[in-house]
Amino acid sequence: MWTVRQAVPKDLSAVMEIYDKIIDLFQEQTGTRAWRKGVYPTEAVFQAAIEAGTLYVGELDGALAAGMIITQGTDKTYGDAPWQIAAEDAETAVIHTLGVSPGVGKRGLGVKMVEGAVALAREKGWKALRLDVLEDNAPALRLYERAGFVYIATKAIWYESTGTANFLLYEYVL
């Protein structure tokens, strides 16, 4: 059985284990520089997200299998992107750091996490979900396009884990 729920403090170690596996796989198979151990995402990032109520986890048959951070408002690094709809920060949210444990891959759990984010957005009355994806992260690009996100623009954005790099901005209008 699959469920998406808000994370609680006892989830932290399992979440870190999932993301460590994802980072290892990224570096081994794809070469993408999206995330780096000790840089992003870190235990402190997930701890802060749990405390803020913005970390969500996916459970498969009672075991944690995925995670994502959803924050209200559009990320300021997106600048003046040509979004499909005009909306105030209170009417939008951004999906960050969505990841599925490599041990449970190929079951559509990434799409199910996005569906959970869409359901949360509808519940909160948000008008759009937005996100950025590093241009060489082909698995994430496929996931978001398959889930109904629309490409908006490519922006050079600086993150500690990547330095300045091209990110593709996507939007899902609710």
Question: Each predicted region: which residue ranges?
Answer:
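Conserved N-terminal entry element of GNAT/NAT acetyltransferase domains
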Residues: 1-13
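Conserved GNAT-fold acetyl-CoA-binding loop/helix
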Residues: 3, 23-45
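A short helix-loop-beta-strand connector motif used in the catalytic cores of GNAT acetyltransferases and
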Residues: 44-57, 73-77, 94
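Conserved beta-hairpin
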Residues: 53-68
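Conserved acyl-donor/pantetheine-binding loop and adjacent beta-alpha core of acyl/acetyltransferases
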Residues: 69-97, 102-105, 158-161
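Conserved GNAT acetyl-CoA-binding A-motif
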Residues: 114, 121-132
